[in-house]
Amino acid sequence: LTHVLAAILAAIAFVPIDDRPVVLQLPVMLGRIAGVTVEPPPRALLGRFFELGKPDAIIAWLNHEAAKPQTNAFVISSDMLAYGGLTASRAPGPNYADAESRLRELAHLRTRRPHAWIGAFGTIMRLAPTGIPAGTDFFAPYPTWSYLQQYANLHDPPLPSETARAQHLRELIGQPALDAYMATRGRDLAINRLLLKLTANGTIDRLVLGQDDAGPVGLHVRDLQLLQADLGALGLAGRASIEPGADELGTALVANAIARAAHWIPRIAVRYSLPDGASFQDPIEYAPISTAIDALIGLCGGVRDDEHPDITLYVRVPTTTAAADDTLTSAMAADAAGGRSVALADLSYLRSDRDQASFAQRLLASGLAARLDAYSSWNTNANTVGTALAEAIAAGAGRRMNTYNALAHRTFTFIMFLDDYAYHDEVRPDLNATLAAEGITDHTLLAPDVAASMTQRDRALLWGYADAILAQLDPGYHIAAMLIGLPWSRTFETSIDAALAPNL
């Protein structure tokens, strides 16, 4: 009863970075797994793609949540609070003074709830502005965003071998657009430095700044170095971190808050599918994958412990051999059979979608998928690992508080296989090929009639995979209801809202 009461009084007010399923739906579902309420603002306040969020209304909502005695933690996107979301953070718009004023409201929140836990997450601006088609009424439509991306990926300053290319790109971009881009980077850097100061003065308990989509070379390197120097000078080790990633940051901090509600520090072991797996480099992360993985363990509220773990994270890297796959699956099966918590992050999609699909099919057909506490395989190393760790931690916390919701857990895992495997490996290529056959090669923002047609095709195809996947994951359950869509009128992601029910 004490544990159940603790869960009830551990509600989390959660401000996501935008309204996409991976950053809004998944953190809320983590709460359901653990039996902890994760409350986001009304959907209308979060905006949609180029329709920016409403930070001032979200501040009012936060004050309302702060008045609730059961709200014990806050997990807040600084990009949403300062600018109106991730897309807004990459574009001119709110000036520094407006953004700074909004973030100062965090101090008001701290005054009202001095004992609440406040976690904040922000992004270090990626090198490319948001990709959008030519003619779109937003910052840097194609081809400008592509030229900016190429320019920002050069060394800073450009190497002698890059000088001519840099000059040509500057001419293609045009000085007004380049100035606006650089000013946006400067504004975001100044806001991130402010967040570090707010953490140093105790306003924020835990801060993470994620480097969004950028490799080891580019305009971001100088920003990273300055922020890392600030972090060190302010003595924030353990309270603030700078790491690769973006979309998983809110999910990881929600997992941290859930683990705190359970008074649990998860011990995490990491097992790579190849001996040198830790050194693999995701092309849009600035450091080897082990950097983000170790950082995410801490961000989720855990500690690395390869000897006596509560959860073992298995990481399947690209180019894993057939023999290594056999060893990997045997080890996961042995852990699961022993009642140990197993999370799988499959990174093979970084090289081959077909390899990823084949391994997902193997997990499902063997029954091993049903015995995992977490599965993830999407977009980047940090995205994948952060999601897998968070799901396993939510389940572990719920079990420790006696508030674990097995049906919510089944639903989360079902959606991950349906999205990460069926949509991205099977359905999305079909949608893109269909669009290309119709002469539509830019899929970053579809016209309304095209989006409606592709949504219908998405639903029809994905439903065909859904029943088969659920039959392998949970043969005693059926899909009671499911909504499928293309939430941002593009093929980059799908939305899946599923309700499972036991067979009668």
Q: Could you say what each language-model-derived stretch is?
A:
Residues 11-504:
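An N-terminal assembly and electron-transfer interface module characteristic of large anaerobic redox
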Residues 3-11:
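Hydrophobic alpha-helical targeting segments used for export or membrane insertion
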